[in-house]
């Protein structure tokens, strides 16, 4: 989930399939569709021409069947086909593979390290499943998101696609713990950098001049893929996006086993702050947001739990090293403002604290809500819309009580100064024993 904090236009509905014609069209590869594709043959009892007189045997025209088209399944738009049916052998695409360099170069060919890596087949299959879901959903979303849509339409369109492709609608108790959405979809506009998703009743509409960070996660059995991108329709922001994308790729390149966090942060800051952006005749240096970090990812724990590590995006600080077997979200944030974020606006993101104290709860609403959270989300982050979707109502008092008792954490939106613009790009990387895998890498970013 995004960041870890250091200290008149027609709507394009992401949930639609292009109108009634598309809705009634038979699915590719369906029996109905295949029957239509094998047309052009005569019925034995109809339309067969006679030769000779009436006593002669009737000759029937030979059937000429068209060859059936090879209809391998492809993903729909919007994405709605469960991914396991597109990859029936559970062989999901691997991410970008990068061999270790310098003193770790031996890992690529070392037989012991290769053996350790082969022991991680289930781990890798689950991560690659989640990563391919993320790629397919985001690549459609990048085409479909347009000015004039509400933030609720955008967020829910992405979430419905994730639920469909993982095969986990999340409405039955425990279903979302097996797979699906890893944390609320962030749709963060302009000076808001992270942790914003619409609550019920939100009417905010995406405008042409907005810069929107889209941050969403997918998990399979708690293996979380966390990746984010930024959308801007006005080319005036191109340099801002380029700066942050460059910084993220620099961080990914630097990351590896035994690499110090401080060295990664210094490289990220140098790359990002070599850019500037001109807006309405004024040049702004792109600043790394110094109190936002990348982070380790644990199973069912987006920020790595109590032993989690942070990946800074500015120089100085932590001398901790990355280690073999760790999973990281490498994310960077750039801003035309101060390069520092604060809590602002209405909270929507929450998560149960993994090692929360066993506090006696006096409010029955808090007890009941904690039971719902535990059985449906565990320690995965959730938002108010997800509670609404499960049929919960009048839960705010109980939710605030859980926060006050240190059982649930609240994650308010994180914002720079109003009038500034922020951008974000993020990937999940696996530090495998013999190679580094950028698991969420795609053709888009």
From Swiss-Prot:
InterPro entries, alphabetized: Creatinase/aminopeptidase-like, Met_Aminopeptidase_Type2, Pept_M24, Pept_M24_MAP, Pept_M24A_MAP2, Pept_M24A_MAP2_BS, WH-like_DNA-bd_sf, WH_DNA-bd_sf
Q: Name one Pfam family in it.
A: Peptidase_M24
Sites binding a divalent metal cation 2 sit at: 226, 295, 331, 426
Describe its function.
Cotranslationally removes the N-terminal methionine from nascent proteins. The N-terminal methionine is often cleaved when the second residue in the primary sequence is small and uncharged (Met-Ala-, Cys, Gly, Pro, Ser, Thr, or Val).
Keywords attached to this entry: Aminopeptidase, Cytoplasm, Hydrolase, Metal-binding, Protease
Q: Where does substrate bind?
A: 195, 303
EC id? 3.4.11.18
According to the record, cofactor stoichiometry and binding are noted as: Binds 2 divalent metal cations per subunit. Has a high-affinity and a low affinity metal-binding site. The true nature of the physiological cofactor is under debate. The enzyme is active with cobalt, zinc, manganese or divalent iron ions. Most likely, methionine aminopeptidases function as mononuclear Fe(2+)-metalloproteases under physiological conditions, and the catalytically relevant metal-binding site has been assigned to the histidine-containing high-affinity site.
State the protein's name.
Methionine aminopeptidase 2
For this chain, the family text in UniProt reads: Belongs to the peptidase M24A family. Methionine aminopeptidase eukaryotic type 2 subfamily.
Where does it reside? Answer: Cytoplasm
Q: Which domain of life is it from?
A: Eukaryota
């Amino acid at each position: 989930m995004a960041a870890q904090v250091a200290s008149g236009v027609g709507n394009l509905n992401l949930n639609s399939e292009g109108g009634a014609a598309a809705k009634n069209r038979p699915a590719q590869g369906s029996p109905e569709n295949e029957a239509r594709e094998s047309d052009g043959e005569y019925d034995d009892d109809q339309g067969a021409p006679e030769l000779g007189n009436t006593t002669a045997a009737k000759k029937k025209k030979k059937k000429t069947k068209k060859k059936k088209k090879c209809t391998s399944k492809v993903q729909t738009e919007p994405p709605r086909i469960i991914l396991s049916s597109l990859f029936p052998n559970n062989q999901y695409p691997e991410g970008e593979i990068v061999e270790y360099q310098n003193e770790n170069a031996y890992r690529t060919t070392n037989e012991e390290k290769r053996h350790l890596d082969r022991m991680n087949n289930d781990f890798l299959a689950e991560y690659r499943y989640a990563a391919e879901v993320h790629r397919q959903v985001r690549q459609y979303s990048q085409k479909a998101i347009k000015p004039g849509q509400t933030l609720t339409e955008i967020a829910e369109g992405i979430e419905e696609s994730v639920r469909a492709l993982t095969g986990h609608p999340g409405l039955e108790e425990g279903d979302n713990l097996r797979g699906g959405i890893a944390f609320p979809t962030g749709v963060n506009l302009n000076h808001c950098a992270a942790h914003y998703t619409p609550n019920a009743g939100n009417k905010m509409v995406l405008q042409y001049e907005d810069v929107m960070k889209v941050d969403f996660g997918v998990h399979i059995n708690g293996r979380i893929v966390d990746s984010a991108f930024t959308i801007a329709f006005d080319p005036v922001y191109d340099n801002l996006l380029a700066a942050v994308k460059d910084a993220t790729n620099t961080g990914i390149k630097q990351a590896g086993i035994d690499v110090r966090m401080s060295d990664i942060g210094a490289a990220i800051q140098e790359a990002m702050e070599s850019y500037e952006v001109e807006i309405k005749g004024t040049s702004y240096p792109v600043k790394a947001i110094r109190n936002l970090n990348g982070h380790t990812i644990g199973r069912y724990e987006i920020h790595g739990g109590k032993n989690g590590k942070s990946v800074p995006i500015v120089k100085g600080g932590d001398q901790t090293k990355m280690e073999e077997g760790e999973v990281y979200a490498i994310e960077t944030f750039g801003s035309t403002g101060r390069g520092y974020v604060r809590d602002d606006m209405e909270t929507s993101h929450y998560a149960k604290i993994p090692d929360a104290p066993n506090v006696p709860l006096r409010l029955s609403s808090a007890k009941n809500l904690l039971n719902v959270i535990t059985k449906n989300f565990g320690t995965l982050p959730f938002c108010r819309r997800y509670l609404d979707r499960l049929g919960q109502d009048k839960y705010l008092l109980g939710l605030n009580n859980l926060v006050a008792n240190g059982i649930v954490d609240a994650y308010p939106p994180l914002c720079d100064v109003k009038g500034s613009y922020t951008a974000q790009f993020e990937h999940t990387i696996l530090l495998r024993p013999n190679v580094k895998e950028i698991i969420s890498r795609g053709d888009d970013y």
